[in-house]
Amino acid sequence: MVLDKEEGVPMLSVQPKGKQKGCAGCNRKIKDRYLLKALDKYWHEDCLKCACCDCRLGEVGSTLYTKANLILCRRDYLRLFGTTGNCAACSKLIPAFEMVMRARDNVYHLDCFACQLCNQRFCVGDKFFLKNNMILCQMDYEEGQLNGSFETQVQ
């Protein structure tokens, strides 16, 4: 997926007295001590919003996406311009805005990212093995190795 632009919302320092900027959202002068800048325009904190859902994007640390001169939140950007795919475990569609897990070229719903033999869900830091597009926990992988069922590489 290619973004036109993804940017953090910079909170600019105190603006110089006598040189107040105009807000691109409401066209009023920004009299606040701080102002925001996005798409090379200045905004009140309350005026910088997603063009689709009107959620506020002016909070410190928030990220906004721009495409075709629209300012969007992550969810709406992915809904409008993101790509969807199918889960490698259940084959159901994964919406573009949904969080996923990846193992090589495979993409999984978070709930589907589990050993496909014993259904043990993986936690951060757990070892897992990928064999014939199946995700295996360490115990099932080692059991398969002892039985001579398969060989694969550690992920």
From Swiss-Prot:
Pfam families: LIM (PF00412)
Keyword Cell membrane: no
Chief place where the protein resides: nucleus
UniProt keyword Zinc present: yes
Domain LIM zinc-binding: start-end pairs: 21-83, 85-147
Gene Ontology biological process terms, A to Z: positive regulation of transcription by RNA polymerase II
Source domain of life: Eukaryota
Function description: May be involved in gene regulation within neural lineage cells potentially by direct DNA binding or by binding to other transcription factors.
Protein name: Rhombotin-1
Organism of this sequence: Danio rerio (Zebrafish)
Gene this protein is translated from: lmo1
